[in-house]
Amino acid sequence: MSKYIFVTGGVLSSLGKGITSASIATLLQHSGFKVSMVKIDPYINVDPGTMSPFEHGEVFVTEDGAETDLDIGNYERFLNTNLGKKNNFTTGQIYLSVIEKERRGDYLGKTVQIIPHITDEIKRRIKEVAKDVDIVVVELGGTVGDIEGLPFLEAVRQLKHEVGKTNAMFVHVTLIPYIKAAGELKTKPTQHSVQELRRIGITPHMLVCRTEKPLPKALKEKLADSCDIERDAVIEAVDAPTVYQVPLNFLNQDILVPIAKQLDLGDLHPDMTEWNFIVKKIISPQKSVKIAFVGKYLQLKESYKSLIEALIHSGAHLDMKVDIEWIDSEDLEKADDEKLDEIFNEVSGILVAGGFGERGVEGKLKAIKYARENKIPYLGICLGMQLAVIEFARNVLGLEYANSQEFDPDTPEPVVYLIDEFIDASGQKQLRTHKSPLGGTMRLGGYECFVKKGTKLYDAYKSDKVIERHRHRYEVNGAYEDALKEKGMIVSGKSVEGLVEAVELKDHPWFVAVQFHPEFTNKLKSPNKVIMSFVENAYKCQRSC
């Protein structure tokens, strides 16, 4: 039978439940177990796809086309695996599924209630993930005591009894605040949080304590005694120089001992040699390179979580620190040539990230033009590719009114236009118009890209076919391909249907733009190749360009 580890959070949010969950899963995976993960989000949205980046942070896209919580990205990067739609679900999805069943008559006229119908649907989804693995780690979003989370806590409480006490474990992530004025660490918030869990019928088997200061032995013993857990199951989680250090910190505290004891796993000895080697490269690299990151959601940098991690991973594998120079695209709109020189003077590469809407677009166009004219290595992603084509069409082809239909539906030169027909990740034909609903209507998930030999994109991938993930409604208009090629911008990647997937400049040290999101396939142990090529060429350029 599969084993279950449920990770809850107390006191307040953003304590690092996702990293804690991923770290535990990683240690178990490196101990030889087949591990998967689930993230439960208690909000009523069906998925985060239509939520503002400022509200939710990044929307992570899986191989099978799900728009998910950014923690799914953390799980994939830690476990070096691909997850999917079944690994993330929300209150909205649960209620929608139950209501659809009720409308079909699946409940045979019964009154539909939280218990058993909602809780049964939650348990069914968790069990579905557990079917093919040894251990599933389930992170429950939110904080204990939130009204939205009660059905989920009840469901996992029931599940524990169904699978038996040696097949389920509860890990509670909590805060031990340090009061500077008193010079003391305080345990009372954690004690109250555990009491709240107990009222629901759950007693945690382990505490993971976020803290600014190391926890004295006496304080750990106090927590263990007051919360009724074993003393070796109080784990401290101090801030680390990188999140990838956290599994190693946990391992140094023998976190697997109480886990193995509770789940009857035997002696565990994870091999973290390769992991430790990469972490050292992240913390103490020999070289450095500065990259300008041009975006429009910089107030919440978690909007670009996967891309930031991809740069870090590429740097680690090149023994290099990637210093990110954050540049708000709206600030560039007001900048003259002298100001642009000042902004980009010390950077060795320019990255223009994806986004939606017209805000900040003119600033991104200025950054792209600067990279093109000054021979600075450039990577454009999603909108960053579309704008690279618009900039080239306006300033090199002389098409003054070249634009995207996203910003000007009536543009006379639609070099970027709405994808009105495509085959989705499940093989189904999809039709779209400007009036189609926003939720779940984009080109989503992994698609094949055929790479043209003799291009920089081919040099990066060393393959003529790759699978990368997409999240977009608009696409470069293939009708302009010949005109672009004649002036030096070539299409270096296309989809099965012939959609433009990548463009690059022939007479430039390294100018590549892609419609897909390479950051979504990036992993700690296997960085995305086009992002790593960008970082590598930016470093080369700072020394020779």
From Swiss-Prot:
Activity regulation details: Allosterically activated by GTP, when glutamine is the substrate; GTP has no effect on the reaction when ammonia is the substrate. The allosteric effector GTP functions by stabilizing the protein conformation that binds the tetrahedral intermediate(s) formed during glutamine hydrolysis. Inhibited by the product CTP, via allosteric rather than competitive inhibition.
Positions contributing to L-glutamine binding: 355, 383-386, 406, 473
Top-level EC class: ligase
UniProt GO BP: 'de novo' CTP biosynthetic process; pyrimidine nucleobase biosynthetic process
Similarity-based family: Belongs to the CTP synthase family.
Binding sites annotated in the UniProt record for UTP: 13, 186-191, 222
Xref: InterPro entries: Class_I_gatase-like, CTP_synthase, CTP_synthase_N, GATASE, GATase1_CTP_Synthase, P-loop_NTPase
Region (Amidoligase domain) residue spans: 1-265
Name of encoding gene: pyrG
Source organism of the structure: Nautilia profundicola (strain ATCC BAA-1463 / DSM 18972 / AmH)
Binding site for ATP: 14-19, 71
The EC number(s) this enzyme carries: 6.3.4.2
Protein name, entry field: CTP synthase
Metabolic or biological pathway: Pyrimidine metabolism; CTP biosynthesis via de novo pathway; CTP from UDP: step 2/2
PANTHER family: CTP SYNTHASE, CTP SYNTHASE-RELATED
Record's keyword terms, sorted: ATP-binding, Glutamine amidotransferase, Ligase, Magnesium, Metal-binding, Nucleotide-binding, Pyrimidine biosynthesis
